[in-house]
Amino acid sequence: MNKIRKGDEVIVLTGRDKGKRGTVSLRKDDSYLVIDGINLVKKHVKPNPMKGTTGGIVEKAMPIHQSNVAIFNAATGKADRVGIKVQADGSRVRVFKSSGAEIKAA
């Protein structure tokens, strides 16, 4: 079970975007995340008349390692850690470590 999933709101802990919040839009591999508006780089794209794309400079969100982000707890307004709790029926749910509140699925 992944502790950070697509649709979760996260806050960046390290790097040039430290303190910024964003929503996870994609999980790459097992430990990299693409977050909307975070870790933006400028890519130079060649024009391709076969595909109908024009060339130019495009801003693109690049992956960031999950160890550099933490899930955002809206109740406290701070970054929080994620724990796994086993329910009575055997199912597992994600909870905030600070409060024990269940994290709602996005």
UniProtKB/Swiss-Prot annotation:
SMART domains assigned: KOW (SM00739)
One Pfam family, short name: ribosomal_L24
PROSITE patterns according to UniProt: RIBOSOMAL_L24
GO CC, any one term: ribosome
A GO biological process held by the record: translation
One GO molecular-function entry: rRNA binding
Domain of life: Bacteria
Keywords recorded for this protein, A-Z: Ribonucleoprotein, Ribosomal protein, RNA-binding, rRNA-binding
InterPro entries, A to Z: KOW, Rib_uL2_dom2, Ribosomal_uL24, Ribosomal_uL24_CS, Ribosomal_uL24_KOW, Translation_prot_SH3-like_sf
Family as reported in the entry's similarity comment: Belongs to the universal ribosomal protein uL24 family.
PANTHER family referenced in this protein's UniProt entry, alphabetically: MITOCHONDRIAL RIBOSOMAL PROTEIN L24
Function: One of two assembly initiator proteins, it binds directly to the 5'-end of the 23S rRNA, where it nucleates assembly of the 50S subunit. One of the proteins that surrounds the polypeptide exit tunnel on the outside of the subunit.
Protein name: Large ribosomal subunit protein uL24
